[in-house]
């Protein structure tokens, strides 16, 4: 993945929990997802992996670059919260090009997607446990007659709970808070045929390439503290083992029968005090 250097922070206004910023680079303006944001580097790992898998399914996503943020990168925004965020994000971050005239897509724009493309989007989001593509927030961008899938940082939730993963965990259906914007596509007669074709596109080598695109510095903060004190060589070996664990999890999830595709998702109950989690089991 190409590496660019951030030369100036142009806009640091808060834009959701991921708190991306708009920056200037030698190749133009970019939107940067920061490693120091609330979701941490795990969100950047998810963004890269899901985008790589989307491209393997011929779905439109934005090109990605790695962006170096120096501790002395100039900014005219003197907000203390932003300053803390930038300080916590020194080093490599994830960059997306800032598109001209981009806006959030609406239902009126979705005619540009074929039924098969809608099915592929639904299938991919179920595979990677992406809860963020709903009627309220489609996370689809429109620019210059083109749609792009965006914001996959909340996917791959299993990466925060490796110690509780069992042999059966990858076969769990998965849970969502709200229905997917294209949920009804799974009721079409062709769904079973489509989902089989999608699975054939995601070979083990595709999964391995997706993980190879993830920088070690994004995996490092996700390792247990007991591992971090090892030598650099041992640490790199542990990072590669963790990448292999992502591949193994997704590969097992892709094995037939794919419950995530053939069974409806489990919906979690939300209230203002806490989230009541239903167990992710096959029902």
Question: Model features per residue range: what roles?
Answer:
Residues 1-283:
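Phosphate/dinucleotide-binding and metal-coordinating scaffold of catalytic cores
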